[in-house]
Amino acid sequence: RSPSRGLGDVYKRQIQMPYGNIGRMKSWGADGNMEFYQQIGKDAHVILRSNFTLSKNKILNWEDTKKPYTYLENNGYANNVQRGFVAMGLFKDQQDVEMSPTQFGTVRPGDIKYRDINGDGKITDDDKVPLFAYSGVPQLMYGIGAEFRYKSWTLNVLFKGTGRNKFLYGGSDGKSFDGYMPFNQKDKGNIMTIAYNPENRWISAEYSGNQATENPNARFPRLYYGKNENNTKPSTFWMGDARYLRLQELSLAYNLKVPALQRILGINSMNIQLMCENLAVWDSVKIFDPEQATSCGQAYPLPARYSLQLYLNF
């Protein structure tokens, strides 16, 4: 939609332009798969498999009202790019607050300190910059699998993972942001115990009796009652890396032939298989499953599953 095409400044504020397919976006990427087979003697073989998908895009033309700074424009950035403030840690003391640009609401020591990108002496939406692209959707996805077979035994393993995938803690859809739990909701959130740990948050020395607790690099800002207008802004302070590598499947199977069963029941062979799913994940999120990053851990976690399966071949 173009809210500006062909309109003067006066009319832009009074007329709602209709939607139109007038933008241009470039999309590109790559995908591929590979399989390797190796026979080992007459009783064993190994199969290695891998695949990947890489997807990127860039807006070439987005008709919009003129922005005061180029980093506020959509042109040249990915579609649905996440914008936010650049955090500089936490305010150290009241002097630090007074010597810094004005921010949001009543700011105190222990609150998040933002960078004044345009240098106008105040923090506003004009200081929001592109933080990351794709808003919770990974640019890179891949899988790695292997099969090892020896006589009647078969071992299968499957890994899957993502790359180039960031998110905001507290963003319910990876884009909107209402604050990091438990700072936005006092009655729920599976990370409340993390914030409760004094080592993870800024605490005034007036209460702790220890100057070291006023840590400007703490994981959490100061605690407060209700909602803090300053600390619930989208920023690099709440940005996380959602890339991961997961051991998705691991199975061990044994193929068995019992002549007596073939004569009596017509069963030519049986395959007994132990299947394990979602066994382990390596990531930097830690406090909840990285595939649930956009839900901020409020969804039911992905369980590990174990099953014993029996297949009959008649």
Predicted regions and their residues:
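Single conserved hydrophobic/aromatic residue that forms the stacking wall/gate
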Residues: 1-11
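Transmembrane beta-barrel architecture of outer-membrane proteins
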Residues: 15-16, 24-30, 52-58, 138-142, ...
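Conserved small-residue
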Residues: 23-26, 30, 37-136, 171-217
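Outer-membrane beta-barrel "beta-signal"
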Residues: 31-33, 302-314
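Membrane-embedded beta-strand positions of outer-membrane beta-barrel proteins
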Residues: 32, 48-50, 157, 272-274, ...
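Transmembrane beta-strands of outer-membrane beta-barrel pores
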Residues: 36-38, 52-58, 150-152, 161-165, ...
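Repeated loop/turn-to-beta-strand initiation elements of outer-membrane beta-barrel proteins
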Residues: 41-42, 152-157, 259-260
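Extracytoplasmic gating/loop element in the C-terminal half of outer-membrane beta-barrel translocons
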Residues: 162-266, 270
